[in-house]
Amino acid sequence: MALENPKMHNSEISKRLGAEWKLLSEAEKRPFIDEAKRLRAMHMKEYPNYKYRP
């Protein structure tokens, strides 16, 4: 979406992608959810003492 609309602000891109996400079925969302879980577990293994500090 960012490549198709290079002048669009990030906030607008996020809103549109959020709207698209809400339209997906659970089956369509599942690969993304599973990948997020895999990456989270990998990060926890590689950085066990990591603490989020904004």
From Swiss-Prot:
Known DNA-binding region: 1-51
PROSITE patterns given in the database record: HMG_BOX_2
Domain of life: Eukaryota
Gene3D superfamilies (UniProt xref): High mobility group box domain
GO CC terms of this entry: nucleus
Keyword tags: DNA-binding, Nucleus
UniProt-listed SUPFAM superfamilies: HMG-box
InterPro entries: HMG_box_dom, HMG_box_dom_sf, SRY-related_HMG-box_TF-like
Keyword Nucleus included in the entry's annotation: yes
Localization per record: Nucleus
Keyword DNA-binding applies: yes
Name assigned to this protein: SRY-related protein AMA2
Organism of origin: Alligator mississippiensis
Lineage of source species: Eukaryota, Metazoa, Chordata, Craniata, Vertebrata
